């Protein structure tokens, strides 16, 4: 018996009117390669199997609540331009209505996961107590909407950078009372994450760094940050939470230099303080670009360390030098991302979070769908091409050939430590390696072209029938 997709209307979400009338009640679906309809996928077909697994399982997409629902497209030169009919007064009533709109958006867009900061979902109120009371009030609605839709929480986090008290940092700040507030927010979100079934819990140290070295006690700040994370680990264990802890590296902005600069720096810090086994990395494309690294570098480091825990799917504006959070629109970047993800066996319980926003000129509600649809299609192109490369095996064969000399007696002797230093040096004296005979060309350009070729061929023969993901099917 064929499984039937569930049909939900805006009324099922408790909304009085449709916030997205331009969709005419029709969710975004796959309509075939080359489709030019702005509210349809031309490459992302969620239920289609790639390498034996549905596409939506390879690409666990998540909506970023802060950009999608709260972002008004303001910048340092002017106020927001975004037209968001659901944005009203900063009240609990409006917060609840906004949440209903958010879940309706995800349902219509076909996004299975969502991610949020504590300050995204409710007003702060007059103090921390009121803030946390507001969170307690909205949690039942979160559970109700998750049950209605099958949408799950990819990760929760705490905003420890926006409140004025965090101007000098949170866990690395100069005042213990600020540290205490930061930990109270973190503890609360650990509790919330457990209640709503969050898969992960992200730590991003937006102001955990410095702006002036002249005034810095580096050792004190590093110890305080380590203690903060250690206490989070302890509290997670105390309450029996199962979330995976993730740290999101970023080199700068808003501080001059942040302590979670890149994945290798994060690993060194975690290992120094005995925390490496408790955390993985949430790698953002734009953040990697800010440290002048391609995102596949950061992904490869994380994967090699066994610490690839999630991805923020966006990209920067080349040459700008700041975190512009554009939607991913370059299929070749997507391809390099997916090569690493497939080689890693996926993201485990991690998600690909659309930490991205429309441009200031793209201010209408429909632009939220246009941008997410384009980003999801871009990743799908990357997945299809990466899968084709994996099936053909040419890159794997080239890598095996490249490092084959390490399978020789000399290579094994060095790697295993079984060859004495004198014997190693005698081997060096006995043979002078020559380019072309002992050391072959790597043919790098030809291997780069394999990616172009795969992107050209990956959609040949793809059928145009939409296949629903199981999470959207009727019981």
Give the residues covered by each predicted segment.
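Active-site acidic/histidine proton-transfer and metal-coordination neighborhood
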Residues: 2-16, 22, 47-50, 97-101, ...
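N-terminal basic, low-complexity leaders that serve as flexible interaction/assembly modules and, when applicable
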Residues: 2-85
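Catalytic domains of carbohydrate-active enzymes, especially glycoside hydrolases
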Residues: 53-61, 90-120
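N-terminal small/glycine-rich loop or linker at the start of catalytic domains
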Residues: 57-89, 157-173, 205-212
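Conserved, mostly hydrophobic/aromatic
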Residues: 63, 106, 182, 193, ...
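Active-site beta-loop-alpha junctions enriched in small/polar residues
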Residues: 66-68, 119-121, 158-161, 206-208, ...
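Gly/Pro-rich active-site loop or hairpin
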Residues: 73-97, 216-222, 256-268, 279-280, ...
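Flexible, acidic glycine-rich loops studded with aromatic residues
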Residues: 306, 320-473
